[in-house]
């Protein structure tokens, strides 16, 4: 992509309305623009990151055997009345009437609707297990939306819902999804800690929150140092991990630790995922029954699994930034490479830049080629801000000798590379 053709409205100054780092950087880098309190337009750069995260989450859900569906944003209120949850969300749930005086709502979650779909389409234990997920925009009318997309009113979620014949099988599915979450967050390039949590209004008696470790996190997490091995270990024993100690600050009690205090470390965390074993709460309330192997009508066992896709964008920034801007993990970066031509009027610089641009594009490497008239200092500031993992810098002096600079955004290390060796080094 040529920067001269791209829509990248960067801001030089910090926006006064932004309180947290991710909100400031998303506005400054031209990822989003606010339309109303807690409601944002995603501009091209931000949308690329959102889609990259969405695709990685989708891949891991598919690997876990979940099947993608797409439920509507707008839901009939009678389903929520039937499940007994219509009043649970209070004014956070946006309700309205259509022209026929039917009460509708903008869904904050989908347990009620998925249960309705299940009860009308699955009748026998032979059709189980089933695990359905969707990625859809939701709305919760927060009193004080803040921190940009971290706590907006409109947000993108991945929701999955599993259905099993009994508790034993439901817990097996829960563990499979627990593992899928660990793998998904690793693929996203972030370090997460799963913490035992309350089920809240969702219902049920087994639940885990997943917190990204970030210095600016809202929660303090206390956890076994063994969790640090998850960063590089793809072979996960779920039962072993679930036995490791992890607790949010409100549940941390030094005198009740199952291991020594020396084995515990603490970090700030941002919640980005939550999974629940719900049991039969919705199936009983909504009469979602199936015939078991003995022909007896039995309420289905359900679990629910959520990942905040749009919230993840902000959380990843909080965990991967410095004073200059964002430092994207390669897996979610909008562009893997920023190609910076410091002098677009120098024929040798143009020659090397266009050669590198073609080679990168031919290899399907996402590259943003800065072919603008901006000054070198301005170009460096822009590309440090938007956070491409690698920068290829082409200036007249070194270009004359077929040399370009390759900069690693995270470490700041710059090395001289002969242009013919560029692809092999990358």
Curated annotation (Swiss-Prot):
Which of UniProt's keywords are assigned here? Aminoacyl-tRNA synthetase, ATP-binding, Cytoplasm, Ligase, Nucleotide-binding, Protein biosynthesis
> What does the UniProt entry say about where the protein is found?
Cytoplasm
Q: Which GO terms describe its molecular function?
A: ATP binding; proline-tRNA ligase activity
GO cellular component terms? cytosol
| SUPFAM superfamilies assigned | Class II aaRS ABD-related, Class II aaRS and biotin synthetases
Question: What does it catalyze?
Answer: tRNA(Pro) + L-proline + ATP = L-prolyl-tRNA(Pro) + AMP + diphosphate
Coiled-coil intervals in this record?
none
Gene Ontology biological-process entries: prolyl-tRNA aminoacylation
Top EC class for this record: ligase
| UniProt xrefs under InterPro entries | aa-tRNA-synt_IIb, aa-tRNA-synth_II, aa-tRNA-synth_II/BPL/LPL, Anticodon-bd, Anticodon-bd_dom_sf, Pro-tRNA-ligase_IIa, Pro-tRNA-synth_IIa_bac-type, Pro-tRNA_synthetase
Enzyme Commission number(s) from the entry:
6.1.1.15
Subunit organization:
Homodimer.
- Function description: Catalyzes the attachment of proline to tRNA(Pro) in a two-step reaction: proline is first activated by ATP to form Pro-AMP and then transferred to the acceptor end of tRNA(Pro).
Q: What family is this?
A: Belongs to the class-II aminoacyl-tRNA synthetase family. ProS type 2 subfamily.
**Protein name, per record:** Proline--tRNA ligase
The primary gene name is: proS
